[in-house]
Amino acid sequence: MLTTLIPLSQLNLPPNLQNSEQIQPLVTAEFASNFVHQTLQKQPDLLAEWLAKFPTPDDCCNYTERLAKILARVPNEEMLGRVLRQFRHRELARLSFIQSNKLATVELVFQHLSDLAESLILAARDWLFQRCCAEYGTPKNTLGETQELLILGMGKLGGRELNFSSDIDLIFTYPDIGETEGGRKSIENSKFFTRMAQRLIKVLDEITADGFVYRTDMRLRPFGDSGRLVLSFTAMEDYYQEQGRDWERYAMIKAKILGEDSQNLNHRYLKQMLRPFVYRRYLDFSAIQSLREMKEKISREVVRRNLTDNIKFGAGGIREVEFIAQTFQMIRGGRDKILQERSLLKVLPRLAELNLLTQTQVETLHNAYIFYRQIENVLQAIDDKQTQTLPTDEASQARLVFACQSYYQQDLYSEKTHWVEHSFNDWQQFMAVLSQYQQAVRQIFNEIIGEEETQANCNPVNEKLAEWKDILHYNIRLEDLSAVLKGYPKVAENDYTEIFRHFSTTFQDWVKRPIGVRGREVLRNLMPRIADSIFKGEDHLLLLPRVLNIVDKITTRTTYLELMLEKEQILPQLLALCSKSVMIAEQIARYPMLLDELMSHRGLTDVQAFEKYQSALQDYLIRIPEEDEEALIDGLRQFKQTQILRIAAADILGVLLVMKISDHLTYLAEAIINAVVNMAWKQVSQRFGVPEHLEADEKGFAVIGYGKLGGIELGYNSDLDLVFLHNAPEDSQTVGGKKEISSHQFYLKLAQKINSIFNLNTSAGVLYEVDMRLRPSGEAGLLVSTFNAYEHYQKNEAWTWESQALVRTRCVFGAENLKQAFEKIRQSTLAQPRASGQLRQEICEMRQKMYQHLSSHSAEQFHIKQDQGGITDIEFIAQYLVLAHSHQHPKMAVWSDNVRIFDSAVECGILSSEQSEQLQHCYTALRNKIHHLKLLRKDSVVDASEFTTERAFVREMWQRLLA
């Protein structure tokens, strides 16, 4: 039969052997496995050995002793790798021969496969330990006892049920901390074993010209790929006690100490340490839901990765048999000690013994499992590849049909074996038998574990969350992420890699943090909601890092995580705010207590009344000792940032209009200016006393706000343009201090101290950037002037642009008499007669200079502030109206803000109401856009297609008034 499937001439056998019936077992082995054929080609001595005597199960023994003899002569790691690979290939080829010729039971084959793997791993470990001790010294604990590297074999290796071409899942550990002795330089035990483990993985896993020994997977260790490669017993115990999850309990059921020795105290201690984590003393029914979630996760992975023809993960497959057994082990293993067993095949009859399953159910599961494992081993032996997917090519299908038609199987309750025969001769019949097994297993699974069609699976939203929950973990894979993101139409495929980078980087950081079991469980449930919400929107690439940064700052504050998870209104509001403002995202990350206020729509948006900012600031600072200057300044910054956050939230959520936003930002700045002046005054006066001309509680000092501050039009990131004035007589001195100085020097030191407070950079950042260049004579002028000197300068020396700047001024700090004195200077200066032609010319020249230096000069873009038709043009129009008409209409000089200047122009008959309203509309629309761009930390530039109507009207008004 075999020769009709693959002619002997294709097997590259010697010509004199091609027609001999005696070599039929060899033909069978080569037919079943390309790997066997390749191994015989590479190792002709093995072929000669087989032709002299074909392999038998008795030849598959003494791996440890045979390896020890061979490795005793190995001089270096390169040779070590080569010898291990050649040994592995010879022995696997031998086992494939035995399997394909049906010389042993299915169970015996994977027991030998497991023993071979264990021997190879331990041989490599022991050789490397000696080499590392020679290089670094011998690792010892504080008692001087030599430490060893213990290796936990997980999964099928631990259960002694390894596949032909399985990965091996390992966890490395060592008993005690300490240092090496006897080396050139002592190193910590952790470094010694980490270096040794890295070399061991390389020896086993690296693909060389000789192939590999075993693909090695370390992801089952604490914290997965992000965790340390080797842990001490203490670190491992701490992890499993504090952070171990149910899926890790599930995995640990099969954990085996490789080379386990009951006389070894370290081996005994490690087993005793892990047992309470895996097996609870009570009946642990809470594990059922965890197991069901794990199975549903795998089922979703089957769909996501198109694994429907996978005999391991598919419905009724290997994994479901394992789930049934391990469910009972997790629930009852602590009480029923006979369930504390690594081998699935040994556990199954014990489930019947405990009446947890019927005899029929156990036999069904046992027979199905053996059939599946025969399929799996045959598939993997073909090309030495780890696969559980049924083949689509006819040659592999024929191999599978032949191998699974009949085989030896061990009896369920004894050491005896029996011959199993299935009545199929082709692929279709094979699939029918396989389907019968799968249906039988699935029925038992549903009876024990429960139906998978839960509400989560029926609800598309919950199903999406479940998919996210499956993949959002420390070992997130781009392949899995891409599969989930395909369900979000607004996410472009080119974005997948960047999204993966954000998640991967974040999770790698989180794995090292003491988040705790409760916190990690909340994160497991919260992150899917965050991801689902973010990727439903347009701005996911901007929003994802902002929100991850917030969550990053609260990972160890479980209360906040729970708040975000339990209060449904928090997440949508948080995403709405963060999508429109980088600033808000950063502030919430810095001050997580603001999350509390997201619980109600009015919470975060409940801004102060205008007149309450000053008292609110006083209340905020009262908790800080007066002598702690830096803490007070830091408090000022925190108060400012918190209040700006509230204003921004009210802006984004539509609670405040644009004019009110600027009002709030301006009054907030005034409250802070008031606090800064008082703080500076106290410090300067404690040293120098106070100017002698002052009455009690007077300061004789005023702060003049220019620009946006003066015009009550501050933005989120506006500087403060300030000028300082005082009313001290020329020959005045200070009194009551440690040192007397002139009053002018006093006010100069006061101004310097105010500047210092504003500019001090603390952990909360700079309070405000302060610009003093608008003072008389600019940077060449005095830092603080008298009222008289200021008036003289404004009326006799100021340039036209300085008079323009004076339009937008207010006294923002000072006693009432000083405010009145300043306003008198301002209005009288603005009301001076001016030649309208010269005024227009000078304003236009200044505007042209600004345009040349500051505009975008782009046909595709529009700079909202500096380009023609933008905010600066509107401001210049308002300033022109004041300077040109205040002499005739004093009312024009009253207001410092543009909107009320335009209102006054209507009252004075200078503008029509329609012109005023349209200018106000243009101004507020452009300012509103700038506000929102600043929240996103973007420049004040938009596409040239925006605001075309507004820009056209502003240019028209410019031509009408100033051309």
UniProtKB/Swiss-Prot annotation:
EC class, as a word, reads transferase
EC number(s) given by UniProt? 2.7.7.89, 2.7.7.42
What keyword terms does UniProt attach to this protein? Answer: ATP-binding, Magnesium, Multifunctional enzyme, Nucleotide-binding, Nucleotidyltransferase, Transferase
- What Pfam families does UniProt report for this protein, alphabetically? GlnD_UR_UTase, GlnE
One record GO biological process: regulation of glutamine family amino acid metabolic process
A GO CC annotation recorded here is: cytosol
The entry lists its GO molecular-function terms as: [glutamate-ammonia-ligase] adenylyltransferase activity; [glutamine synthetase]-adenylyl-L-tyrosine phosphorylase activity; ATP binding; magnesium ion binding
**Gene3D superfamilies, per this entry?**
1.20.120.1510, Beta Polymerase, domain 2, Glutamine synthase adenylyltransferase GlnE, Nucleotidyltransferases domain 2
- Which InterPro entries does the record cross-reference, listed alphabetically? GlnE, GlnE_rpt_dom, NT_sf, PII_UdlTrfase/GS_AdlTrfase
Report the catalytic activity: [glutamine synthetase]-O(4)-(5'-adenylyl)-L-tyrosine + phosphate = [glutamine synthetase]-L-tyrosine + ADP; [glutamine synthetase]-L-tyrosine + ATP = [glutamine synthetase]-O(4)-(5'-adenylyl)-L-tyrosine + diphosphate
The protein's required cofactor(s) are namely: Mg(2+)
Specify whether Cell membrane is a keyword of the entry.
Answer: no
User: Which SUPFAM superfamilies does this entry report, sorted A to Z?
Assistant: Nucleotidyltransferase, Nucleotidyltransferase substrate binding subunit/domain
* Chain residue ranges for the region called Adenylyl transferase: 461-963
The segment annotated Adenylyl removase runs over 1-453
Record-linked PANTHER family: BIFUNCTIONAL GLUTAMINE SYNTHETASE ADENYLYLTRANSFERASE_ADENYLYL-REMOVING ENZYME, GLUTAMINE SYNTHETASE ADENYLYLTRANSFERASE
Family statement: Belongs to the GlnE family.
Per the entry, what this protein does is: Involved in the regulation of glutamine synthetase GlnA, a key enzyme in the process to assimilate ammonia. When cellular nitrogen levels are high, the C-terminal adenylyl transferase (AT) inactivates GlnA by covalent transfer of an adenylyl group from ATP to specific tyrosine residue of GlnA, thus reducing its activity. Conversely, when nitrogen levels are low, the N-terminal adenylyl removase (AR) activates GlnA by removing the adenylyl group by phosphorolysis, increasing its activity.
Q: What is this protein called?
A: Bifunctional glutamine synthetase adenylyltransferase/adenylyl-removing enzyme
| Gene name linked to the record | glnE
